[in-house]
UniProtKB/Swiss-Prot annotation:
Pfam families per record: Fer4_7
Protein name: NADH-quinone oxidoreductase subunit I
GO cellular component, one term: plasma membrane
An MF annotation (GO) of this entry: quinone binding
Cofactor: record remark: Binds 2 [4Fe-4S] clusters per subunit.
Top EC class, one word: translocase
Topological category with respect to the lipid bilayer: Peripheral membrane protein
PROSITE patterns reported in the protein's UniProt record: 4FE4S_FER_1 (PS00198), 4FE4S_FER_2 (PS51379)
Source superkingdom: Bacteria
Keywords: 4Fe-4S, Cell inner membrane, Cell membrane, Iron, Iron-sulfur, Membrane, Metal-binding, NAD, Quinone, Repeat, Translocase, Ubiquinone
GO biological process terms on file: aerobic respiration
Function field: NDH-1 shuttles electrons from NADH, via FMN and iron-sulfur (Fe-S) centers, to quinones in the respiratory chain. The immediate electron acceptor for the enzyme in this species is believed to be ubiquinone. Couples the redox reaction to proton translocation (for every two electrons transferred, four hydrogen ions are translocated across the cytoplasmic membrane), and thus conserves the redox energy in a proton gradient.
Length: 160
């Protein structure tokens, strides 16, 4: 009698397993085929850094060095020079992406929205030196992602 009960329990467990599989076969898929399919990103996602420009092509950074001062990882290095009209601009703007912790403090501290963390999360490299971003690389990122960056900034600041 005991063997019959054990056998009955095994059969019931098997039927339950098959039912679970059968039900899940007709549910919508939740798996993304990553390289070809990408999931949605939050407008507040913090990815690869970029320096933005004004509409006339001039860089936004005014060399106030607030981002350098607030960076907890000390990943940002800025050198500034004064221009003929009395304003300052950056001569050197470097970010060591191997040190960066993607906290977003630099973006929050910037009074002119010059430094932002963009939507790009695919920036793997083969060497460590490629993760040392200079001003030209950051401006290039800003030019490539400007439309998405502008949308994200407007979306996160509804009261301005």
């Amino acid at each position: 009698m005991r063997r019959v009960m054990v056998l009955f329990g095994v059969v019931i467990a098997g039927v339950k397993g098959f039912m679970l599989t059968l039900v899940s076969m007709f549910r919508p898929k939740v798996t993304l085929r990553y390289p070809s399919e990408k999931g949605p990103l939050s407008t507040r996602f913090r990815g690869e850094h970029a320096l933005r420009r004004y509409d006339d092509g001039e860089e936004r950074c005014i060399a106030c060095k607030l981002c350098e001062a607030i960076c907890p990882a000390q990943a940002i290095t800025i050198e500034a020079a004064e221009r003929g009209d009395g304003s300052r601009r950056t001569v050197r703007y470097d970010i060591d992406m191997t040190k960066c912790i993607y906290c977003g403090f630099c973006q929050e501290a910037c009074p002119v929205d010059a430094i932002v963390e963009g939507p790009n999360f695919e920036y793997a490299t083969e060497t460590r030196e490629e993760l040392m971003y200079n001003k030209e690389k950051l401006l290039c990122n800003g030019d490539v992602w400007e439309e998405a960056l502008d949308f994200r900034i407007r979306k996160n600041r509804p009261y301005y």
